[in-house]
Amino acid sequence: MINITVPVFDNDYFVIVDSESKELAGVIFSYVGSKSKYVPLFEFPITTIDNTEYNEDNLDEHAISRRRSREFNIKVKNALHRAGGCKYLILGNLDKDQRSFLSFLDDYNLIEINNVSEVDSFLSPIVSKNKILNCREDELLNALYYAVSNDFILKIDNSSPKFVEVNFATEGLVVIEDVDRVSTVVAVNYALSVNSQIKVIPPLKVNHIDIRNFIKEWKDGDDNAYNDLSAELYNGIQDLDFNLYEYATFFTVGGPYSLILNNIIPITHVHLRFSPDFFVFNNIFFENAQNVNSALVFSPKEFSDEETNYVINKLEEGNFYVKDLVGDNATLYNIDHHVKQYPFDVLHFCSHGGEIDGHSIVEEFTDRNGVKHVIEYDEVLAFAIQKGEKTVGVHSKNIWRKFDGLIWGSREFKEKMIPNYIISDMINEMDRRIDKNRTYKKVIENSCMIKCWDSVYQAMFNIMAIHHCPIIFNNTCWSWSDIADSFLSVGVRGYLGTLWEINNGIAKKSAELFYDKIFSENVLQALQSSFLPTIGKRDENIYIYWGLPFTTLRPATSIAKSKKNVAEELLDSVWDWEDRLQQTKKKSTKEIMEALVEWGINEIETNFRKEAIEIISEMKDSQQG
């Protein structure tokens, strides 16, 4: 097993910094950071409005920002509770709009720092460091790592001499793409907490679509595409000798470094775009927390020979309670509700995956100022049919392509700085229209799905596993990106996916070897064992792991106890949703909550009646006692 100690939280400090205030986050961390402990550090996304009441029935230009900020408040408040509180709650460059969303500020000793020049006056009285290291902004991360390692505090001075990197002998390596976000400071924080060396490299010049296209062209027979991908990813790491380390973690915007490095050592990845602050925090917390010891196994039985039964048996050998969504139970309705509303620590997918068909749509609309625009996008639909339900759930995903002729997300698109209200007008208008100018397409690029018994699953959710952070093994084709994004954003401890279309025999053997080791070694080491069937084959290096190297799954005491854990979580969830219903005004939101409550009650009555009665009886006895 990889020898790595799980970090502990530093309960003295809890830091929340505006996501674009990288230098400020670095200077603050130089004061409060230390080796071998992890300071809870989070980046607050940009907010365009304060937390005021509004008409939720119509999407306005602030809807995305408002929802994102409210979700951040819930998640960071939970993290603060899980960390055990703090002596000092430090806010870095949060404006009044951002602060208005934080509902817990009055409960803690609050320190508000607006810029780098204020850091020393606020933090020097509460820390014992007094040695100073001057550095330039462009050398922040390397200097920060050295400063915290040697009890220096950091001062930004762009006239300083060039910082000379100092490498320490460590077992682990953390490679950080130097994007202009606070998340890179989170990466330094993590590296110090696990006593790993860092290597800062330039940001990638390619995005996940470019990377996927390189891989697709390579697998279609163009070896130059692999060379082009390698050239992009090797920039910055070509001088590293990975044989000096036992494992490496890449903080990246999507680079599959394990592929181009041929898994020379055990490698994990952390996505810098999908809440890396919560990803690291949750991995640390749930490694030592009491888990539910529950698993979901999903398979519509698409293959004559697959790993499904083997996986179920291995998880049950570890005394996990396994809920199998297999055969005609592997429906879109079932997987959608279980992912959102069922407590689990492991989810295994065995099915077909990848891109699917849909429609291309071109529509003209007029914004609130009377200006006409043309939007081009692709639409993918799926239908969740459940016997006994009065309505059919429609899962619609739009993939934006062009706006007024500009490629969505391109440099030209960003430079145009389209106002938020135009985007909200566009979305509202598209939602209202029933008849659209649709053209069928056999393959929708960048679409992603998992084949169900009756439809396809596109992983569209914002809650998961009743706030547990599970490990996902998506053993379908092309599962490393796009469909992985929802899981990484909402919160997992680990996500294992494939970089291209995998051979079913390889997928089966690899999964079986992985679960053979899952309770005796950590997840990363179990993954190394699963590589054996791929060596020398077309699928060599096909798997990529989004996770951290210390993550483990521990066996439970008994399946009966694990099943009771699930029942208890389901009961708590139903009661929680019922409480929220009383406070909710929006009709559509109430309908969603009512459906979740109804599903939870039905799940308890159908599969956990005995356990629920026992739990409620114990609660009554406890209250009477």
Please place each PLM-identified region on the residue numbering.
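Active-site-proximal C-terminal subdomain of hydrolase catalytic domains
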Residues: S196-E217, G405-I434, R438, I466-Q624
